[in-house]
Amino acid sequence: MSGFRRVDESTVHQGHVWRLATAEFEAPDGRRFHRDIVRSPGAVGVVPVVFDAEGNPSVVLVSQYRPPYDDVVIEIPAGMRDIDGEDTADVARRELIEEAGLSAGDVEHLGDILPSPGMTDSVTTIYLATGCTPVPHDRQGPEEDFMEVLHVPLVDALAMIDDGRIRDAKTVSGLLLTDRRLRAADGT
């Protein structure tokens, strides 16, 4: 392995979902050092894709207020793995209904990303959702109450990464993984 070893860890703060810990580690040469770590149950992001009559893909994104940035962020529907034992595919389906009002016919695992490995153990699992149909839904909290659902051609969403309108890591990863998956499916 790496030769590094965790020697000790204690909880500094326990939040509703996350836990802030401080940990002591030993390097391969015996030096000891401390790091603060945000312990997280992880998250799931889902890229809902809808095809037009010509077979061109569009994605469904959400634009929502994010308090840490005090700004609106364009993202794929996503949420925390905050229900013990819930399968990640079920989290993807749940979040898609809650945030975008869509039920997925199929979900396909695209990959797992480490959103900020220098500070958290969080893993975000990314899914592709197809065969989506509108369903009634209840929003969960003030940010979601004011969330805007956006239907964007995939080619335009990719351009939004290039011009900086989409900066969220799970969304950038999800859109690029989706583009790669769809290109592989049609042989381009």
What are these regions (language model features)?
Residues E9-V47:
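Acidic, metal-coordinating catalytic segment for phosphate/diphosphate chemistry
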Residues A21-D29, S116-P136:
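Active-site-adjacent beta-strand/loop module that shapes the phosphate/pyrophosphate-binding cleft
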Residues F25, P48, L61, L128-A129, ...:
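Conserved hydrophobic "DFG−1" position in protein kinase catalytic cores
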Residues I83-G111:
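Internal catalytic-core helix/loop-beta-alpha segment
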Residues V38, G55-R94, P136, E143:
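Conserved Nudix-box catalytic region and its N-terminal flanking loop in Nudix hydrolases
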Residues M1-T11:
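Extended interaction-bearing regions that mediate binding to partners or small molecules
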Residues F4-R6, V72, H109, P117-T120, ...:
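Nudix hydrolase/Nudix homology domain
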